[in-house]
């Protein structure tokens, strides 16, 4: 048996039967349920009400075809998905991912994680996620526009400002959000906050672009201060990825006194012992949409290496910001051997279960994704508030709220871990703290017969 509790084992067995072969989703459910062992001992009312049985089953899962015409006049067909996982504390909220790896399992895993992440923010937003196996890389702007319009034509039937609010994720940036919002507005003839991550000229929020990366560093800094009386100051930092999260995590880590020496993409990684020159990275990735290897051609003394060896670089703080399961047990061993003191996840579930176990066993401070990278969805919720009020807040106002939210997420997670006898285990603490609010809401709302 994977669980001490027969009840949790039964729940997990049923999830496995109903979702055969969905490895990402099953991995996420198992990790969360393991954290609930002390909760079901202490809260028999949760078991009696079948809260966890209901929690692991989405309220709604939508799959649809997305036909579109490429620049050669050929009809292409992709799959679209939206999982509306839980709305106990507010409308569904979660991003859209456009990537060839997107499938039912990935969307369900992301939507399930979103329940707890959104709850941890303290804001009234439920959990959802969506996307498509469409790959925007190598497509013209016209092709991306036609795809986005077709995708939104179907998705618009299922979302709304008070029902389900979407946002960006991997493969969905300002361009894609703009195309989809334009199509939604044409179809529904209304200007509402149904998508977040919008451009500033049509209802977007300042600091939304920076939010996930900044929030990751605010969380990590509070974790360092509270658990080890440390900070980013004079620490060597390695960050995987070179997209939005990695870029703004690099910026904030540097502002807080750290030295970021490495970034990566799917082909390899760069190492710059003098500290990453973020202006060069932004030019390559945001303006030219190039590959990270070009950094080594432009910055003397930096080195580009093909492959996935970024975690072999000696560092004090590691921030995986690329994709799920990028950091495995061997990588964890290497980081621990090289003296890492803190790891915090900027991507969704970037560390394998084996890696997480090794970090916790070695006493490495570990900030799980659902807590550490909640800054993006928190600021999305702040964008929803601004849209509802027909107001725009200053960058400083949004950033200050973001910082407070991330500090509170750390302390709520830490306090929950302490309350249930798992002090310092923020994986369990974040799961329990996020679950508590959702469970109470579900208890109050009863069961439909």
Regions found by a protein language model. Give the residues of each.
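Structured beta-strand/loop patches that form or line metal/cofactor-binding pockets in enzymes
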Residues: 45-76
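Flexible, glycine/charged-enriched surface loops at secondary-structure junctions
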Residues: 23-26, 43-48, 122, 159-168, ...
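Rossmann-like adenosine-cofactor binding region
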Residues: 268-366, 371
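Adenosine-phosphate binding glycine-rich loop
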Residues: 2-28, 223-224, 336-449
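General beta-strand structural signal in soluble alpha/beta enzymes
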Residues: 163-167, 190-195, 239, 262-265, ...
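Glycine/serine-rich phosphate-binding loop and adjoining beta1-alpha1 elements at the start
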Residues: 99, 118-233
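Glycine-rich phosphate/diphosphate-binding loop of Rossmann-like nucleotide-binding domains
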Residues: 204-312
């Amino acid at each position: 048996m994977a669980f001490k509790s027969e009840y949790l084992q039964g729940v997990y067995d049923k999830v496995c039967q109903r979702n055969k072969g969905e490895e990402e989703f099953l991995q996420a459910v198992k990790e969360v349920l393991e954290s609930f062992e002390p909760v079901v001992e202490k809260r028999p009312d949760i078991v009696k009400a079948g809260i966890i049985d209901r929690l692991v089953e989405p309220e709604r899962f939508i799959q649809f075809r997305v036909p579109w015409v490429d620049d050669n006049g050929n009809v292409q067909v992709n799959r679209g998905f939206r999982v509306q996982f839980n709305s106990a504390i507010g409308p569904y909220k979660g991003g859209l991912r456009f990537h060839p790896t997107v499938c039912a399992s990935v969307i369900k895993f992301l939507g399930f994680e979103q329940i707890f992440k959104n709850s941890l923010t303290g804001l009234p937003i439920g959990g959802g996620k969506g996307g498509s196996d469409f790959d925007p890389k190598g497509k013209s702007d016209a092709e991306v526009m036609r795809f986005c319009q077709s995708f939104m034509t179907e998705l618009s039937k299922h979302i709304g400002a008070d029902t389900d609010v979407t946002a960006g994720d991997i493969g969905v940036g300002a361009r894609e959000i703009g195309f989809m919002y334009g199509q939604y507005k044409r179809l529904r003839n209304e200007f509402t906050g149904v998508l977040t991550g919008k451009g500033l000229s049509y209802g977007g929020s300042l600091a939304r672009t920076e939010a996930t990366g900044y929030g990751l560093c605010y969380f990590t800094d509070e974790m360092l201060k509270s658990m080890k009386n440390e900070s980013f100051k004079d620490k060597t930092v390695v960050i995987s990825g070179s997209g939005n999260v990695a870029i703004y995590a690099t910026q904030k880590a540097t502002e807080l006194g750290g030295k970021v020496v490495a970034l990566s993409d799917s082909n390899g990684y760069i190492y710059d012992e003098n500290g990453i020159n973020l202006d060069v990275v932004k030019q390559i990735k945001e303006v030219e949409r190039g590959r990270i290897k070009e950094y080594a051609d432009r910055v003397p003394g930096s080195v580009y290496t093909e492959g996935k060896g970024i975690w072999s670089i000696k560092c004090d703080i590691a921030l995986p910001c690329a994709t799920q399961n990028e950091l495995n047990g061997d990588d964890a061993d290497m980081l621990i051997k090289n003296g890492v003191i803190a790891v915090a996840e900027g991507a969704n579930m970037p560390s394998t279960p084996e890696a997480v176990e090794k970090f916790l066993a070695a006493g490495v401070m570990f900030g799980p994704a659902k807590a550490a990278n909640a800054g993006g969805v928190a600021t999305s919720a702040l964008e929803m508030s601004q849209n509802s009020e027909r107001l725009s807040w200053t960058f400083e106002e949004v950033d200050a709220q973001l910082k407070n939210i991330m500090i509170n997420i750390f302390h709520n997670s830490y306090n929950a871990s302490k309350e249930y006898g798992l002090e310092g285990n923020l994986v369990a603490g974040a799961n329990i703290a996020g679950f508590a609010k959702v469970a109470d809401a579900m208890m109050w709302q009863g069961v439909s017969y």
